[in-house]
């Protein structure tokens, strides 16, 4: 007679991200971002691009995987931080998901050591604090172009927050002995605490200030 399934195989009672951190108690306070921050229990945050060609498919990608995807990008040639092409310093992560996964995992360990809290919860707080609510767009009236303030959709708010967190981490370790994992951990912690030293949080304040002046 065959043994029961739970005796033949190890079946965990709770699935934890990267085998270490649970998402059950992670809380999203921002009601507009809540539907788009995916916190489904997932051992390995890797969907192999199955949502890439689906409209709004990013909403089904785990938030940790979206962070991993952001740090893999080399950035556009026109994008600068403090006058330098910061993202190019970490082109070794470009399209290398396993390496980017290990960087994020190491950053989460550092966050856990420094704060004593679940790093996924700290990441969610950082995203909420770094997501701008307003931005500017250009419209043309009578052949003259004007900048006007517009509300930002929740999906774009999340994209901008993750992009600026990744850029801030790159800026912190640019020409510095600090590792990328340490810089990423520091940027997430600073953004979660609304510290002006955080690139992502200060960038959010700048975007909203420009939008307010364009009303």
Curated annotation (Swiss-Prot):
Gene3D superfamilies: Ribosomal protein S7 domain. One of its GO terms (cellular component) is small ribosomal subunit. One of its GO terms (biological process) is translation. Coiled coil: none annotated. One of its GO terms (molecular function) is structural constituent of ribosome. It comes from the Archaea. SUPFAM superfamilies: Ribosomal protein S7. InterPro entries: Ribosomal_uS7, Ribosomal_uS7_arc, Ribosomal_uS7_dom, Ribosomal_uS7_dom_sf, Ribosomal_uS7_euk/arc. Keywords: Ribonucleoprotein, Ribosomal protein, RNA-binding, rRNA-binding. The keyword RNA-binding applies. One of the primary rRNA binding proteins, it binds directly to 16S rRNA where it nucleates assembly of the head domain of the 30S subunit. Is located at the subunit interface close to the decoding center. Part of the 30S ribosomal subunit. Belongs to the universal ribosomal protein uS7 family. This is Small ribosomal subunit protein uS7.
């Amino acid at each position: 007679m065959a043994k029961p399934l739970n005796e033949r195989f190890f079946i965990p009672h709770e699935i934890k991200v990267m085998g270490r951190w649970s998402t059950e108690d992670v809380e999203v306070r921002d009601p507009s971002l809540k539907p788009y921050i995916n916190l489904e229990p997932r051992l390995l945050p890797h969907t192999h691009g199955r949502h890439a060609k689906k409209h709004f498919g990013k909403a089904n990608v785990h938030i940790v995987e979206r962070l991993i995807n952001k740090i893999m990008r080399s950035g556009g040639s026109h994008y600068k931080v403090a006058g330098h092409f910061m993202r190019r310093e970490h082109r070794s992560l470009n399209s290398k998901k396993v390496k980017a996964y290990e960087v994020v995992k190491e950053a989460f360990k550092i966050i856990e050591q420094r704060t004593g809290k679940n790093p996924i919860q700290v990441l969610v707080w950082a995203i909420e604090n770094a997501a701008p609510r307003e931005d500017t767009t250009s419209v043309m009236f009578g052949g003259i172009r004007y900048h006007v303030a517009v509300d930002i959709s929740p999906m774009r708010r999340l994209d901008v927050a993750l992009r600026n967190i990744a850029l801030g981490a790159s800026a912190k370790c640019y020409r510095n002995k600090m590792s990328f994992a340490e810089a990423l951990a520091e940027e997430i912690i600073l953004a979660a605490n609304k510290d002006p030293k955080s690139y992502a949080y200060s960038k959010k304040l700048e975007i909203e200030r420009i939008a307010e002046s364009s009303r």
